[in-house]
């Protein structure tokens, strides 16, 4: 992949993220704040952006979104890495990971 292709992919990801964020915020702000990991002020700003502003923001060369999962424990739980593959175990691991990520969202708010 060339650097131009990579930049085009980043811009497309930015546009997709911004459009999804606006849709979620406009449908249910409280749920969007939780799912996107944003505070209410950022959600209000995103919801109020015009199409031209969204396109301008999306054209940046850096990703506007980031992974919420930033530690090995959550990644291991989500991927069942280094654990036996059992349905009940996977469900428990996913639940545990969701609880950990939800607690981190409350820290942002």
Curated annotation (Swiss-Prot):
Species for this entry: Acidovorax sp. (strain JS42)
GO terms of molecular function: DNA binding
Statement: the UniProt record of this protein carries the keyword Amino-acid biosynthesis: no
GO terms, biological process: bacterial-type flagellum assembly; positive regulation of DNA-templated transcription; regulation of bacterial-type flagellum assembly
Keyword line: Activator, Bacterial flagellum biogenesis, Cytoplasm, Disulfide bond, DNA-binding, Transcription, Transcription regulation
Subunit structure: Homodimer; disulfide-linked. Forms a heterohexamer composed of two FlhC and four FlhD subunits. Each FlhC binds a FlhD dimer, forming a heterotrimer, and a hexamer assembles by dimerization of two heterotrimers.
Protein name per the record: Flagellar transcriptional regulator FlhD
Entry's free-text remark on domains: The C-terminal region contains a putative helix-turn-helix (HTH) motif, suggesting that this region may bind DNA.
Pfam families (alphabetical): FlhD (PF05247)
The keyword Glycoprotein appears for this protein: no
HAMAP family noted in UniProt: FlhD
Gene: flhD
């Amino acid at each position: 992949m060339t650097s131009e292709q990579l930049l085009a992919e980043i811009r497309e990801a930015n546009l997709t993220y911004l459009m999804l964020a606006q849709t979620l915020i406009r449908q249910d702000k409280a749920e969007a704040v939780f799912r996107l990991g944003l505070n209410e002020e950022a959600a209000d700003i995103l919801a109020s952006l015009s199409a031209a502003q969204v396109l301008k923001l999306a054209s940046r060369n850096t990703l506007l979104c980031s992974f919420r999962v930033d530690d090995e424990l959550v990644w291991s739980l989500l991927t069942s890495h280094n654990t036996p593959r059992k349905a009940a175990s996977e469900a428990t691991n996913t639940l545990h990971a969701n609880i950990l990520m939800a607690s981190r969202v409350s820290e942002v708010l």
